[in-house]
Amino acid sequence: MAKNTLIQKILENHIVSGSRTPGEAVSIRIDQTLTQDATGTMAYLELEAMNIDRVKTELSVSYVDHNMMQNGPENRNDHLYLQSVAAAKGVIFSRPGNGICHQVHLERFGVPGKTLLGSDSHTPTNGGIGMMAIGAGGLDVALAMAGQPFRIAYPRIIGVKLTGKLSPWVAAKDIILKMLSILSTKGNVGCMVEYFGPGVAELTVPQRATITNMGAELGVTCSVFPSDERTKEFLEKQGRGESFTALAADADAEYDRVIEIDLGSLEPLAACPSSPDNIKSIKELSGIEVGQVIIGSCTNSSFRDLSIVGAMLKGRKIADNVTLSIAPGSRQVLEMLARNGVLADIISAGARILESGCGPCIGQGQSPANDTVTLRTFNRNFPGRTGTKGDQAYLVSPEVAAAAALTGKITPPSELPFDCPEVAEAEKFLIDDSMMITPPCCGKSVEIIRKKTIGAPPLNSALPDKIDGIALIKTPDKTSTDDIMPAGVHLKHRSNIPEYAKVVFERFNEDGKPTFAQRAVAVRDAGKHGVIIGRDSYGQGSSREHAAICPMYLGVKVLIAISIERIHAANLVNFGIVPFTFADPADYDKIAEGDSIVIENLREKLEKGEYPVEVKAVSADGKVTSIKVNAKLTAEDVKIILAGGRLNCK
C-alpha cells in the first residue's frame, strides 16, 4: 500500500532525473516562474545571454514590487527594461502598484500540484494553495524559463499535524512563530515541511499562505498544504475554479519527523529583535512602549487580515506616541477595502496608506527612529533591515499590531476593552487583471529598452588550481544576505554591479578604515584571491544572487563557513565561488582576518572529490595553521565552479 506524502507525490510528477534518496541531487521540471524587479533585471539579462527566443514554462510572470520609489532614474529604467523584455520573451508583466509578487501570484496564478520557482526567497508562499513553490537565485530561475530542470536535494520531509481550532485573537502568524520556536532558523537545509491533520480544514488559503511564507525563515526548501475544499472555495472566489485539483498525502504517509500543534493551545506570539526565531509570548512583552506599527507585506495583508485591523480600528484613534502605516499586499485587496468602507475606517483612525508593494519590509521607507520599538507584521527582523542601525523590530500578527497601535504599547489583544471582531470572508474577490500586460504571440519584433544604468551580468574567470588568497572578513552566526548585500537605499543599483559591489558587507565596515570592497579590490588587483570566513547559517534570508555576484566581481573565490544556507550555496556555485564548510567547526577560531589562505591543487581535488581539502592559514607573524574543509558538490556543480560560473559553461 502507498505511503506517500503530498510532497513526494508532487515530486514524483516532476522528477526528470536523480535519486529519491534524501540528500541526493534530483532534477525537477518547473511549471511556473516568478521574478520581482530587484532580482528580475539580472535574471532576464541572464536569460538574454542564453539566446532563448521565448520562455519554455507553462507560465512566467515578472512583477514590479520592490523598487517603487522614483528617487532617480534607475528604478524606472529597470521597469522599462523588464516590461519590454517580458513582451519579447513571452512573460506576463505585472505593473508597479499591482501588488507583491507572492500575494498576487497566489490570487491570480497559483495552481495546486504545480511547481513554481521564484527569484525571491518567499516564493514558498504559494505552498498555501498546494503548490511546490521554491525560492532560488535569478540565474536558476532564468534557466527554468529556458526549459532547464531545477536541481535540489531530495528532501527530508517534516510533517506538521495540526489539530484543534485557533482561539479568538490568535492568528495564523502565531502558528508559524510557534514553528520557528521549535525548529529555529538554522539546521533545516534540505528539508521540506508538509502540513496535515484535522486542523488544516480550519485555515483559509490566505492563512495557510502566511504560514508557508515564513517557512522561508525556517530555512526549509518549501512548505506545502493539501489542496481541499478550502482551496476550491478560494479559487472559485478568484474566478479560477477550473484550476482546482484535490491533493493530499496518503492516510498512512510516513514522515522523517512529525511535529504536532494543537491550534487551540496557541497564544499570541512575537519574534523579538533581531531574529525571526527569537520567540516570546505577547504576555511576556506586555507594556513595552511602541513608536511605530506597520501592517501588511506579503506575509499578512490578505483581505481578512486587513479587514480585522479595520474592525479593530473602526471608531477609534491610534495612540499619540505611535505612527501606523498600512502596506497592502495587492491592488485587489486595497480596492476591495476601499469599496466596502474598511479603508476609510483605517484612515480615520490615523493610519497612513502605502502603495501595494514591499516597501518598508525591505527598508524602502518607513525606517523607525533611533531607540524606538517597531511592530511589524512582516517576515524578517534581521539587524538593520528596517533601514535604521540598531533597530528594535518585532514580528507580530495583525491583531497584535493593531492592539499596539491603539494602546501605544505591546498589549495582549485579549486585554482590549472589546471582543475579537467577527470578520466575514469575502463572498467573491474583485477580479481586475488590467494591471497585467499579456505578451504578444511573437516577441521577435519587440524592442528591448536598455538604459545606461543597466549593465550585462559580469563574468568570472576560471577557478585557479592554486588559491593564493587573503581572509578578507570573518562574519558572525546567521550572517544574512541582507548583511552581505544591503537593500534599502542601495536597491536601485541592482542592475549596475560595479556600483552595487561598493557596498558589499557595508554593515561590517568601520569608520576611518578601508571598506570591505576597497580591501577586496586591492587584493584582487594585486593578483590574489579573496576569501570569506563565515560561521553558522551563512547566507540565510533573501535569495538575492547579488550576494554571490558582487563578491565574485570583487575577486572572491572561496567561502569557508561552518554551514551555508541552501539558496546562497547554490548562488555561490552559479557564480564560481567554492562553498566550503569546516570539517571541524572549531577551526573557525584558528583563522584571523588578514591571514593568507593557501589551497594547493584545488581543481584536481574538486574533480576527484578528494575531501577533506587541506587549507593553510598563514598569520601575520608567519605561523602556519592547517585546517580541513569539505564541500557537498555534485559533478555538475564542480563543472560549473571550474569554469568560473554557469554563464561560462557551454
Q: Can you name each region flagged by the protein language model?
A:
Residues 1-650:
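Fe-S-dependent hydro-lyases/dehydratases of central metabolism
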